[in-house]
Amino acid sequence: MLRKNKNILTFFLIFYIATYTSVAQKNYILPEPQNITFPETEKPGFRLSKKTSLNVTGSSLTNPQITDLIKFIKNETGFEVSTSKQNKKSNIELVVDENIHNLGDEGYKISIIPNENLKVHATTENGLFYGIQSLKQIIHFTKRKRDEENFNDFDVEIETKKIESNSSNVNDFNAANITTKGYKNINETAHFYGKEEVQKKTLDIYNITSMIIEDYPRFSYRGMMLDVSRHFMPVDFIKKFIDIIALHKMNKFHWHLTDDQGWRIEIKKYPLLTEIGSYRSETLKGHYRFAGNNPKYDGIPHQGFYTQDEIKEIVLYASKRYIEIIPEVDMPGHTSALIASYPEFGTNSEKVEVKRIWGIQDEILKPTEKTFSFIEDLIVELKDIFPSEYFHIGGDEAKKTQWENSSEIQELMINLEIEDVDSLQSYFTGRVEKILSKYGKKLIGWDEIIEGGLNENAIVMSWRGEEGGITAVKAGNKAIMTPTSHMYFDYYQAKAGEPIAIGGLIDLEKVYSYEPVPSGIDLNEASRIMGAQGNIWTEYIKTPEKVEYMGVPRMTALSEVVWSKRKNRDFNEFKTRLKFYRYFLDINKINYREKSFQ
């Protein structure tokens, strides 16, 4: 039975129009481009049609980003876009030209001008990669804009199942099958909200708004850290996490591979690191702060590590998405799993276990020649597997009580003329830095490496607020800003109704409000702020799905913090663009936090 139902139609129209707002003459790209202008013209900048082809210059037609763009256009429009080397009209030009100036290695330019080809130009393949990402957003939102405009002539007929004309029951509405008359210029069947089916007709052209974009990142370091020691994450998810980083035009993956609760990387010269160190017998139940003197455990063994072949595969996967993987092997503290495997490298001789509980542990490496030889062996095995110029040594939360109580260490300090244990950690860091330098690597450490004296070439990752980063840049060192106040994505996202987390509260607006360049430093010092990083520690994150939930869309907010001009940032405007950007999270099957979009 077919009949008009004005109440239901009104509800549907209001809901649809509220969701699909106009995007004409407005930026909807995320992160916000550095410069975007809209030429004054009534003509569309480019007509995307089934006759459109891709003209590729300076890059391979087999470039996976280009083949992915072709697939994306087909999914969005139904058009089978071909590739061509001919410079004809109705082309999308993808050009890599090292002679293009002012864009840098990661920048790109998009020109959409009437009567001209749509052009995406970049100095490098990396820049082209980011330009293609922005082009995808332009194409998708062109489709959204057109769908909205054609909704004006929507004539809906509803086949109901016993729906009263005055019904306000949402379940009644969802039971209705919606069909259309006069819904022109649409080329596919859409499923609104998963239940209402709308039949669409065919359209041959998508008119893309005229615009010129010149874009490049504000910071060279745009990173995310994932802890896989507390809870191991499978290879397939590590690749997906890399995809999520790339989706946000971020370029650094800090991989926290070792800690007290697990050693996650194969070292062939030291097989016990994975035979013993990758396994813990069980894990703390509930929150650490409530464990008290009688903690409860789940009785479930937890184990996992990455082979060197798997890591090579992951590093290659990341490189194709222009992401640099920075490994972290934590030392001299957070080394219980290491010392459980090889007790001779620990300060005390007593046997220890791979920790089942969170928090700061007593175990600390013995700063002797034997230990430094071991560390060099690690670096020799890892230096080529991880081609990054950076190597993170942790250095945080090293509890030095064992050093203070060891007669051997006290004698060592006298011989080295070291006055206190903080200075001994500085000595330890300096020795490791020399090993890394020998193999062409630069040392990164958490801000505790400042205590006892900062080594000349060390890069400080400032997590206990901003003071560590400020101290570093004033001393002539570089810094990466990642304070717990804004950048810890394992913190709660709301005051109530959230899954268990380590503590704190960092909502979407808090992340977006962060400014990586702190006040109180001059321009020269500010130039040594490399960028910022979000961190996902996994004490209370057992699954890939929860990693995604905790990370997104806070990672989306961070992407704009590290990419866009400070003066361009506006949270309300960001929230509007975020609603459109949600589509890209959906098609990548990301388990984001839906409440952040409300």
Where would I find each of the regions flagged by the language model?
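Bacterial N-terminal signal peptides that target proteins for export
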Residues: M1-L9
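Sec-dependent N-terminal signal peptides
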Residues: I8-A18
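Acidic, contiguous N-terminal accessory segments
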Residues: I14, S22-H191, K195, Q199, ...
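Flexible loop/turn segments at secondary-structure boundaries
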Residues: T62-N63, F232-P234, D260-E266, P332-L338, ...
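Feature activates predominantly on carbohydrate-active enzymes
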Residues: I113-D362, T368-F372, E376-Y390, R431, ...
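Active-site neighborhood of glycoside hydrolase catalytic domains
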Residues: L338-E344, V354-R356, I360-E456, W463-T471
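Flexible, acidic glycine-rich loops studded with aromatic residues
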Residues: K442-A458, R464-Q598
